[in-house]
Amino acid sequence: MSKGIHWVRNDQRLSDNPALSKALSECEEVLLVYAFDDRIWQPGRIGPYRAKFILQSLDSLRQGVESLGGVLTFVHGRASGEIPQLMRSWGAERCYGQREDAWEETEEEKALGREVDLRLTEGKGLLEEEDLPFSLADMPGVFSPFRRKVEKNLTIRPELP
């Protein structure tokens, strides 16, 4: 039986979540994991309003996961240190997550990817590169021509389960 871990980060949705959908389609069992990274969760680094918002979002996600019979697991520390240990103890073969763009997040992806089979997906934007009717090199430099080309050729992707 194949097992995988879905690394919960900034995309805390159960529906229309490309990384979670990929994990569920490739694994028979998926454990959702959120890492409270001490480098981020410290005074002065994260404000009280942002912290409250994230905690409320995680609680909502936890309730949604539990309503489906699953578990949202929380670990304390860097994902690159905690997730490999959890994968070994649970017998998971792969880790899935959404690709991030910020420097610290991409460094953490690289560190985790050196330890486990990490499969990252896009999914933060309304459009992905392959949806564009032109290459990035040929992208219009002004919004109006961009919008006209995209609107003329746009096929809206169906929502993921």
Q: What does each model-found stretch correspond to?
A:
Residues 1-158:
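Trp/Phe/Arg-rich N-terminal binding region typifying the photolyase-homology
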Residues 161:
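Surface-exposed loop/turn segments and immediately adjacent short secondary-structure elements
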